Every structure is written in C-alpha cells, then in structure tokens.
C-alpha cells in the first residue's frame, strides 16, 4: 500500500508542472490570438507552434538533422535541407494514416513532451560548440537585399548520405547566402578564362575601331560645316540688317521658294482677273451689240419713214400728172371705188401716217394738193404675188403693183441709192424737209400733236412706233404662237374704230353726189360752191350727232379730218382743172392705202409660208 501511495504521489507531482506548463501555454496562446487579430501576418507562424502531432514530428526530424550535421565534418556549418519549406514536411507527415495520429494517448503525449523539454535543456550546453542552426523558415535567415540568383553548383566533396527528398527539390537548395556574389565570381575565373577574355576584347576593338573613327570624322566635319553656315548666316544677317533696316534675312532656298509661291499666286490672280475682264467684255459686248441693234433699228425706221414719204410723194405727183391728161379714166375709177363701201382702215391709216410722221393733217393735205411736179416712178424689183390674194382694185389697176422692198414693219422700203436718184431729179433736202413739215435746225417747227392722250392712243394702236425697239415690242412667242393668232393680231381693231369706219362708209354711200364725177357739177360757179358748203355742214352735223356718245377728243379729231378732206371745189381757181384735183388726190390716197393693205397681206402670207416651210 505504501508503494502504491508513493507511486500515486509521484504521478501527481509529475502532473503539477505539466498543468503549469499547459496554463502558461494557454495564456500565451490567448495573447498570441490578440496579436494575430491585430497583425494577421503572424497567423502562419502561430499555427505551426500549437501543440500538434505535426509539430512534434517536426521537432524529431530537426533533432535527427542536427545529429547528422554533427557527425559530418565536410559541412559542419551548413544544413542542405534548410531551403525545404514547411508545407513539404507537412505533406510527408500527411502521408501517415490518421489512425496512427489518433492512437496516441495522453500518457504518450506526456512522455514526448517531457523528452522534448529535456532535449531543450541540453541544447544550451552544446550551443557554443555549434554554429547557429537554421530554422525551417529559411527566408527569415536570408538578408532582404540578397539577390536570388545564386548558382546552385553541386561540389564533388558534398555528397550527402541520406537523401530523403526527390531531385526536383534540389533547385531550392543554394549556396551559403552569406557569401557574396563577387566572391563566387572571383572563384570561377581562371588564367585561361582571363586570357580568352583579353583576346576577345582585342578583336572587338579591332572590328569597331575604323567605324568609330569614320563616325568621329563625319561628326567633326558636320560640326565644322554647321559652324561655317552659322557664321555665314550671321554675317549675311548683319549685313542685310544694316542695309534693309532690321528685317530678317532668309536663305537663298527659302527666298526662291517664296518667290515661286508668289509667282504662282500672281499667275492665279492674273488668270482670275483675265477671266473677270473677259466676262465683263462679253457682257459689255452683248450690251454694245444690243445698243448697236437698237441704233440700227432706229436708223432703219427713220430710213423707212423717209423712203415711204418720198415714194408716196412721187407716186402722188405721178398720179396727179397722169390724172390731168386722163380725167375721164380717173372719174370712172373713182366711181368704181366709191360705189363699194369704204374700208375703215384706210381713213385711220391716213391719220396714223400723219401722226407717225409728226406732220399736221393740214400740211399733209397741202402736200397732196400741191404735188404737181411729174416724177418718173422707180424701177424696182417685183415680188411675185399670188392672184388669189389680189383685190379687185388691184386687178383694175395693175400699174400700181410696182412692189417695193418690204421693210420689217410692213411698209415699202426704198434703198439708199433710190433717195439719191430722187434728189438728183430736182428735189433737194430742204424741199423734202419742207414737204415733211420738218424745217431746218435754225428754225425748227414743233411736232404737231393735239394732246398727249391722242398721241399715246395712236402710238399704242400702231403696229410699230418711231424709236420703238425690239425689246419694247412683244416677243414672237406671245403675239405669234400660230397662224390664227397672227391673223387676229393683224386684223383686230377697236370696236369704236369699226363703228366709226362703218358710219363713214354709210355716209359716203348715202351721199354719192358729194364724190360723184358729174361734169355738170364740176363747172366752176359760185352756186356750186355754196351747195358744197351746205353739204359739208350737213355731214359735219351728222357726224357730231352720231358721235356725241364718244369722247370730245375723238369728236374733234373726226371734225378736223372731215374739214380737211376736200369735198367741193376750192376757192382758188387758178387753173381750169383745179376743181378736179382734190377728188383725184383722194382717189390716189385710197389707192395707196389699198396698196399698202395688199402689201401687208402679201407680207403676212410670205411670213406664214416661210414658217410653214
């Protein structure tokens, strides 16, 4: 019993230090846990220091390595397995079955811990004899600035007896980290290596020598050239500044480039200017052509007017001369003319002639009365006329078909040489001007127009006006779309004009004795003149009554026309044939008007035929 008690007490006493150790370990682990919460980098280290089977096996493995290191003399201060990491050892320990780990009881654990403590107490005694051991975490033993490119050269003397690890882990082994890289390199160089290095450097120097010399020479020449250019540029710049006055001096190349650019710009500008000038010339040429056309048209119109008046006067004079010798023929011709209704266009054309030529009606009548000089008619070219378009009056008088050169506006046009021939036969320019009512420049006669309203009305009704250009006329597309429109424009008259013409025709038919060629009435006597005056007054009164509905201007116009048309014999009986002159002249006027109408019709037909072609 005593032995059992002593044995029990010994066990209790042995457990007391173990309990103290465990309590201290728990306290330390508690502190370590607090530190780990603050510094999470220390967790891996703390996991390895917990009392676990892996840790105990690691301690045993370390002891075995120490024993092997003490026995070997070749490498007393270096452990070749210091580079092995802890996970590798854990892997080796992990290969053990779990049953062997769990099979250890508490008593066995106590024995293992006791042995470890004893070994730890024995270590300080052997520590001065040995160098400091390297722990498993070899990274802490290496300095921070140590490079990782140490050569892993295996020396022949270093042959380990116990190689537990496979060859793949030999790469982790390295030379002594405390040995400098320079020392390792110095050990590798030999005299042979140095000799080869010297020869290599010599060869390299020979190869690179000429190229480097050439480069140096080229660099030197370039520097000299640039220096010379800078000096020249500076000198030229100074001289140029002295001459010009502080302006920058450009090199020759830049000056040439600038000159070429300026020349190109100047050429472009000149080309643009020439184009603009050409355009302006074209425009001005077109305007000039238009002005020339207008001038030509005005001249043509003036020449048409002059030639028309001259030919008209010559025809009247010729007709008057032939009328004296053939009174019977003219009387019969007048009877045949006035038996038919008078064309209303003839009367208005007479008025239009007087207004167009700016000749007062009384002067025109005087010209018709006094045209006594016989003038031979001009022999001009004849234009073929279709017989269907010839009126009865034209057929009765074929001698009137001395067709003139038609003008643009439908009136006979005499060429310039015809005017000279007419003047050479006894007429002068002053005579023609006096006949036309246009005196010399020294004594100008104002043109006759009763009022502006009648002038505008007559000019608006005329097919053309004096001085009217093509630009003012209607275009062909408007007034000549086809044959019918042209014919309507040619034949269309005002309603008032038609009424007036019809009334005059009825009056002439109603009173044929006024213009009747009765020889009994043609005997000059005082009683006949009084009867003629009474008839004239009756006609004027009838006209006024009929035209009372019209405007006063038209009434005055018709009254003036009726007054100026000779009805009876004139007062002056200078010659015995004088009473018959007015009637003959009126017949000539009507014949001329009919001839103009026929010529207009022929011109219209010719134009229509040309357009149809």
Curated annotation (Swiss-Prot):
Pfam family, one: Granin
Keyword Disulfide bond tagged: no
Subcellular compartments: Secreted
PANTHER family on file: SECRETOGRANIN II, SECRETOGRANIN-2
Further information: Binds calcium with a low-affinity.
General function of this protein: Neuroendocrine protein of the granin family that regulates the biogenesis of secretory granules.
Protein name: Secretogranin-2
Source species of the chain: Bos taurus (Bovine)
Originating gene: SCG2
């Amino acid at each position: 019993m005593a032995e059992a008690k002593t044995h029990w007490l010994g066990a209790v006493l042995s457990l007391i230090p173990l309990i103290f150790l465990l309590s201290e370990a728990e306290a330390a682990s508690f502190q370590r846990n607090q530190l780990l919460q603050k510094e999470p980098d220390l967790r891996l280290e703390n996991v390895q220091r917990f009392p676990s089977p892996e840790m105990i096996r690691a301690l045993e493995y370390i002891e075995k390595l120490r024993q092997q290191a003490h026995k070997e003399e070749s490498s007393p201060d270096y452990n070749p397995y210091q580079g092995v990491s802890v996970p590798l050892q854990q892997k080796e320990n992990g290969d053990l079955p779990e049953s062997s780990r769990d099979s250890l009881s508490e008593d066995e654990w106590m024995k293992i811990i006791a042995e470890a403590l004893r070994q730890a107490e024995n270590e300080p005694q052997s520590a001065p004899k040995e160098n400091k051991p390297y722990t498993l975490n070899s990274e802490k033993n290496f300095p921070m600035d140590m490079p990782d490119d140490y050569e892993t050269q295996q020396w022949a003397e270093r042959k380990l007896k116990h190689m537990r690890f496979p060859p793949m882990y030999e790469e982790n082994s390295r030379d002594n980290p405390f040995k400098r890289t320079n020392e390792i390199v110095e050990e590798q160089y030999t005299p042979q290596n140095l000799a080869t290095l010297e020869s290599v450097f010599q060869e390299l120097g020979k190869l690179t020598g000429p190229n480097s010399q050439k480069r140096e020479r080229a660099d030197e020449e370039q520097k000299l050239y640039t220096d010379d250019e800078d000096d020249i540029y500076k000198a030229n710049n100074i001289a140029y500044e002295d001459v010009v006055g502080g302006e920058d001096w450009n090199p020759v190349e830049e000056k040439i480039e600038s000159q070429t650019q300026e020349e190109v710009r100047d050429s472009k500008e000149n080309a643009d200017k020439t184009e603009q000038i050409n355009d302006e010339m074209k425009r001005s040429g077109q305007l000039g052509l238009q002005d020339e056309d207008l001038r030509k048209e005005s001249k043509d119109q003036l020449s048409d007017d002059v030639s028309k008046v001259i030919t008209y006067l010559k025809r009247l004079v010729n007709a008057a001369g032939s009328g004296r010798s053939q009174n019977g023929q003219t009387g019969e011709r007048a009877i045949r003319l006035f038996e038919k209704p008078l064309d209303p266009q003839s009367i208005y054309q007479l008025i239009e002639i007087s207004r167009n030529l700016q000749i007062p009606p009384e002067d025109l009548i005087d010209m018709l009365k006094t045209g006594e000089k016989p003038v031979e008619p001009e022999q001009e070219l004849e234009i073929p006329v279709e017989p269907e378009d010839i009126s009865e009056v034209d057929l009765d008088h074929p001698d009137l078909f001395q067709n003139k050169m038609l003008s643009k506006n439908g009136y006979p046009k005499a060429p310039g040489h015809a005017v000279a021939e007419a003047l050479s036969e006894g007429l002068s320019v002053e005579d023609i001007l006096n006949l036309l009512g246009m005196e010399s420049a020294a004594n100008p006669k104002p043109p006759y127009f009763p009022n502006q309203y009648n002038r505008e009305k007559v000019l608006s009704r005329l097919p053309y006006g004096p001085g009217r250009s093509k630009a003012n006329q209607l275009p062909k597309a408007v007034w000549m779309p086809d044959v019918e429109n042209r014919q309507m424009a040619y034949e269309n008259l005002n309603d008032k004009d038609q009424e007036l013409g019809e009334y005059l025709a009825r009056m002439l038919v109603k009173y044929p004795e006024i213009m009747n060629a009765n020889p009994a009435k043609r005997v000059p006597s005082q009683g006949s003149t009084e009867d003629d005056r009474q008839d004239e007054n009756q006609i004027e009164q009838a006209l006024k009554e009929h035209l009372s509905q019209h405007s006063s201007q038209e009434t005055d116009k018709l009254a003036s026309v009726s007054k100026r048309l000779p009805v009876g014999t004139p007062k002056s009986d200078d010659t015995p044939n004088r009473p018959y002159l007015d009637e003959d002249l009126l017949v000539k006027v009507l014949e001329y008007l009919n001839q103009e109408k026929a010529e207009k019709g022929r011109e219209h037909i010719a134009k229509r035929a040309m357009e149809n072609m």
